[in-house]
Amino acid sequence: MSEIVAAALAAACGRHLGAAARIENLRRESGGASRQTWSFDAVAAGTRHELILRRDPPTVAGGEKASSTALDRATEFGVLRAAFQGGVRAPEPLFELTAGDGLGEAFVMRRIGGTAIARKLLRDAPYADARTRIAPQLGEIAARIHSVDVARVPSLARREAADQIAGLRATIDTLDQPQPVFELALGWLDRRKPAPAAQPVLVHGDYRTGNYLADESGVTAILD
């Protein structure tokens, strides 16, 4: 598998970097149940580019999405580009792969230093100072995410509170057994749902430890 990925990346990076590319240090990162993340270096014209490949796994590419709310790679690329250009602390998206590259829906972005491992961030001594900064940094980054112009990503679906409640209820109904606690919670939410927003904003659907990178200075990038 890695040889196939490396060959496809060499061709794609060569097109976008303007020179023949050599792929080094290719490895698949752990995590990401519904998406594959590959780390690699592309060396072209004497310059080393530290990059990340995001792709659908073969079982997902061309088939059903991993979940009803999952974004396709093209939309994810568009959201990431709009966020990066809007000043969000996020990896810079570089280019999308084509069908001819043979890797399914995929794109390449720059690699950012830091760790997403909660145990290290919460306990290890090198991150002691970072732990005092991460919470306010995440608040500032969340506000920046909310300021991104969603009109720049026309393929991004608008999901009102009522839509999300209905989606959760449909998911619970597939369990084919009573879920009284969830039904009570959804009923409470449904009775108190806000009116449709006049101006929608971009939100991160899974804003938590594990979906950001941090080093000794604090948050380096928001992921996913």
Task: Give residue spans per PLM region.
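Short secondary-structure junctions
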Residues: 20-28
